[in-house]
């Protein structure tokens, strides 16, 4: 805020932050009983917050503050995802070391968090590059290895030549296969790598997605697709090569089509393909220079190998084809051109036979020479299996073909955690010529990083003194593993460390973690759907199987926040020059304005464009609230007799009800809208000469409480102006002091009536109304409406079947016909006495809008012609002039 009304946002925000800190407002004691656990994905230590950070952390701070005011103990911690290649690169560029650079970044970001007033329990701060943290990465590695979930193998890995490190499959992005960090095209390289066997949990990771009711559907679908379970069969084909026969297993989901397999295909890096390349220059040329798995058309080359179709006994040619991938299925497949689009295209380009072995059920005919028939159907040209459905054929063929068996394949691959960089957790293994790879004993952990060495390639390889050590098993010379762990290991369990950050004999206190976990609300970007979120689920399940946790899922509810876009509606970026500095906004308008703007602009999961006008509007709203708080008498009593005061009091109660519902749903934008409308009403009502100061004071107090989770500094200042006890941050969340169950109906009645008055004034061209009469319908019409609600189709007959209504003659009959025409969407009218009372309470709104007195009359108090126009829920209106 600016300097108006004595509000120096900089001084006041710093003062309240100091007071919260001095009072330990946000600390949760270790003996808390299952506190509400609210967590935002901890930030990478870049040193600078952007507006996306502000939004992300404002979301959880608002929720945590609301939960605390609503009576919960709340765990809302913060830490630092501080390992990783960017820090190493920054250190190289600045001729420093990654630790110094990272610590400087953490200090800067902590200052920015504190300036924004985020309420964290800083006593629980964790930093992943701290040896006291990463020793437990190493301890968990040993535990996983002892459980058979870690293996080392030579593997073709994704290699980023720019970062000079291995990437997990999840870190290779898009069809162009670019590095997730630097957008460099990724290549392949064979290296000895350490893997976590995530595939051992593939079924559970997939099946338990159905239980993640609090997760967005798109994230669950992304994980399902990434795990990619496919049910099928593995069937052996005997391949005949010049140097001998070999059985090769092919995986297929369509074993029912095996009689139509007219060729066999191998991946370019399959051992038999590599052997064929050594014998044949054409095959070698294809493998080395032509094969393109990402090409638009399938390509291949015939080899000197043939295969025996186990269903027909026929010899079929074997091709090396670029559409066969070694890491999908078995790296070998039977090709059925008549029933697969890719195989069909390949067969046409290589003049291979195309045979139909499945036909549609019924009389439909297809020509597989023109296009493949890819649906299930009835087997034809399949010998003894003719006439079986595809499903029956698959079952029978699996039973009958020697060596065939049902199988499941996954797209999910084991998680390669080895990284050839310095700034990460050293993998706790030493390599001994006699003993092989040996785990570093737990009592020797942590294996700390040596001093940083400026070098190309892996700096740990250059740390000679650190690298050479003794074997823990035999005492002989050994060499440390020089790879470090993927930084996603750090973030796969950090939420557990927050429960006991200073524990020095275990990664976390098991009893407390079982009490406080899972995280109740987790907030972060959707880009982590198949990396961090999947790995965290894997870790949690493994820890449960190691008897360290009672639960098997880490996050009860997940919110993926949308982006803050530039004013031009595109993603903020330095290159576009459309970014907004949080520090500048905080300096110019204050932290509360920044927080309020990012939370009122849209639902947390939606994108929205930055708006300077929206910032100014948010700032003005806070200034208006503070002026109200400073201008009311907090000790004023409420006059229950005044209808206008009662209207305002009911609106305040309804706002409490609505805002609470919106906070529960994390619809902060709608909560702010409700409070904004209430504040506008209070300002308008306060301008009346007969305004009840007690009602205004109660409304302002409620507004301050309802807005406190979002704009805490301004609300603390307002709370102090209201002589509130303690901090508003610790005040009790308000509850409605009146029954608001009918508020939607009363609001519709009031707004509809006000709109009708406006229409009459505009249509009649009345410049200066001198009075307004609002006439409610006669009571018999309300009776007729209630009877019509219970009518079973015959509205007129049911209504006129009532003796009292029959005595109303044509008036009742005409109204019954009107109701019949509206059925079943009958008016949702209040009972007559409540309708009149509602209109009497709201009359002041019309009076203040038109500067004219308003009378609310019953039908028998008004002119007959006017009263005859009234219906339940739609009073008759007459505007006087002159």
Give the positions of each predicted feature.
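Non-catalytic terminal extensions that flank enzyme cores
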Residues: 1-51, 193, 203-206, 217-228, ...
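Catalytic alpha/beta core of large soluble enzyme barrels
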Residues: 60-61, 70-73, 267-361, 366, ...
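Alpha-helical recognition segments enriched in aromatics with Gly/Pro capping
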Residues: 199, 305-328, 467-606
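C-terminal low-complexity, glycine/proline- and small-hydrophobic-enriched intrinsically disordered tails
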Residues: 728-882
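Catalytic adenosine-cofactor/nucleotide-binding cores of aminoacyl-tRNA synthetases and other
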Residues: 348-350, 354, 579-649, 819, ...
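N-terminal catalytic cores of NTP/NDP-binding nucleotidyl/phosphoryl-transfer enzymes
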Residues: 19, 23, 27-103, 124-140, ...
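Acidic, turn-prone loop/beta-hairpin segments
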Residues: 81, 429-431, 642-657, 673-677, ...
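Residue patterns forming the tRNA-binding/recognition surfaces of aminoacyl-tRNA synthetases
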Residues: 22, 95-248, 332-444, 459, ...
């Amino acid at each position: 805020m600016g300097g108006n009304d004595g509000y120096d946002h900089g001084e006041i925000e710093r003062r309240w932050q100091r007071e919260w800190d001095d009072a330990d407002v946000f600390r949760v004691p270790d003996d808390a009983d299952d506190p509400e656990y609210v967590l935002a994905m901890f930030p990478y230590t870049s040193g600078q917050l952007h507006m996306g950070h502000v939004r992300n952390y404002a979301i959880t701070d608002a929720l945590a503050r609301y939960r605390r005011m609503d009576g919960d103990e709340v765990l809302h911690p913060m830490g630092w995802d501080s390992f990783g290649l960017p820090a190493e690169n920054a250190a190289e560029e600045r001729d420093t070391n990654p630790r110094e650079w990272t610590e400087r970044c953490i200090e800067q970001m902590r200052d920015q968090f504190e300036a924004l007033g985020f309420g964290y329990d800083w006593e629980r701060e964790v930093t992943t590059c701290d040896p006291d943290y990463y020793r437990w990465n190493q301890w968990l590695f040993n535990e996983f290895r002892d459980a058979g979930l870690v293996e080392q193998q030579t593997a073709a890995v994704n290699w980023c030549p720019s970062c000079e490190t291995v990437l997990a499959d999840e870190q290779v992005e898009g069809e162009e296969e670019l590095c997730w960090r630097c957008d460099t095209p990724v290549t392949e390289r064979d290296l000895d790598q350490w893997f976590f066997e995530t595939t051992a949990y593939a079924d559970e990771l997939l099946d338990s997605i159905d239980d993640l009711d609090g997760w967005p559907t798109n994230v669950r679908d992304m994980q399902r697709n990434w795990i990619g379970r496919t049910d099928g069969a593995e069937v052996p084909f005997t391949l005949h090569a010049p140097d001998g026969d070999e059985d090769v297993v092919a995986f297929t989901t369509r074993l029912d089509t095996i009689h139509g397999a007219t060729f066999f295909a191998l991946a370019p890096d399959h051992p038999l393909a590599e052997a064929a390349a050594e014998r044949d220059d054409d095959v070698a040329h294809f493998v080395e220079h032509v094969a393109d798995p990402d090409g638009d058309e399938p390509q291949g080359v015939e080899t000197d190998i043939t295969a025996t179709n186990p269903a027909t006994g026929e010899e079929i040619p074997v091709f090396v084809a670029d559409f066969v991938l070694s890491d999908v299925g078995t790296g070998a497949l039977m090709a059925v051109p008549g029933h697969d689009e890719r195989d069909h295209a390949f067969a046409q380009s290589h003049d291979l036979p195309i045979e139909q072995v499945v036909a549609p059920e019924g009389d439909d005919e297809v020509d597989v020479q023109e296009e493949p028939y890819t649906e299930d159907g009835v087997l034809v040209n399949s010998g003894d299996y003719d006439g079986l459905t595809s499903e029956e054929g698959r079952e029978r063929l699996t039973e009958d073909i020697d060596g065939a068996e049902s199988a499941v394949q996954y797209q999910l691959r084991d998680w390669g955690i080895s990284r050839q960089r310095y700034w990460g957790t050293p993998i706790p293994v030493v390599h001994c010529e006699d003993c092989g790879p040996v785990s570093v004993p737990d009592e020797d952990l942590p294996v700390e990083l040596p001093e940083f060495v400026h070098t190309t390639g892996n700096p740990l390889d250059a740390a000679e003194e650190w690298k050479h050590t003794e074997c823990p098993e035999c005492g002989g010379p050994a060499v440390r593993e020089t790879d470090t762990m993927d930084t996603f290991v750090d973030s796969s369990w950090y939420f557990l460390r927050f429960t006991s950050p200073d524990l020095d004999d275990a990664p976390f206190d098991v009893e407390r973690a079982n009490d406080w976990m899972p995280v109740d609300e987790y907030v972060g970007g959707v880009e982590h759907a198949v990396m961090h979120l999947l790995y965290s689920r894997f870790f949690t399940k493994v820890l449960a199987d190691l008897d360290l946790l009672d639960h098997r899922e880490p996050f009860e509810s997940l919110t993926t926040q949308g982006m803050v876009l530039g004013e031009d509606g595109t993603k903020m970026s330095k290159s576009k020059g459309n970014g907004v500095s949080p520090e500048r906004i905080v300096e110019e308008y204050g932290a509360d304005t920044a927080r309020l703007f990012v939370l009122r602009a849209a639902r947390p999961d939606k994108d929205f464009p930055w708006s300077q006008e929206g910032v100014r509007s948010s700032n003005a709203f806070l200034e208006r609230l503070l002026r109200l708080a400073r201008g009311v008498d907090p000790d004023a009593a409420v006059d229950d007799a005044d209808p206008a005061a009662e209207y305002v009091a009911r609106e305040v109660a309804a706002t409490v009800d609505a805002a609470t519902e919106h906070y529960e749903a994390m619809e902060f934008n709608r909560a702010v809208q409700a409070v904004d409308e209430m504040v506008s009403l209070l300002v308008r009502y306060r301008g009346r000469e007969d305004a009840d100061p007690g009602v205004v004071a109660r409304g302002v107090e409620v507004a301050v409480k309802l807005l406190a989770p979002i704009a805490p500094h301004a609300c603390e200042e307002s709370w102090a102006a209201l002589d509130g006890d303690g901090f508003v941050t610790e005040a009790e969340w308000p509850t409605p002091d009146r029954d608001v169950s009918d508020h939607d109906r009363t609001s519709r009645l009031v707004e509809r009536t006000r709109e009708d008055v406006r229409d009459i004034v505009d249509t009649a061209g009345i410049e200066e109304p001198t009075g307004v009469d609002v006439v409610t319908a006669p009571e018999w019409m309300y009776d007729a409406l209630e009877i019509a609600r219970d009518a079973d189709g015959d509205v007129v007959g049911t209504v006129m079947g009532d003796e009292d209504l029959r005595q109303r003659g044509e008036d009742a009959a005409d109204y019954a016909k009107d109701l019949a025409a509206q059925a079943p969407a009958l008016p949702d009218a209040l009972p007559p006495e409540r309708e009149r009372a509602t209109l009497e309470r709201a009359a002041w709104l019309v009076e203040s809008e038109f500067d004219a007195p308003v009378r609310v009359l019953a039908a028998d108090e008004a002119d007959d012609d006017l009263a005859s126009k009234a219906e339940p829920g739609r009073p008759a209106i007459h505007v006087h002039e002159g």
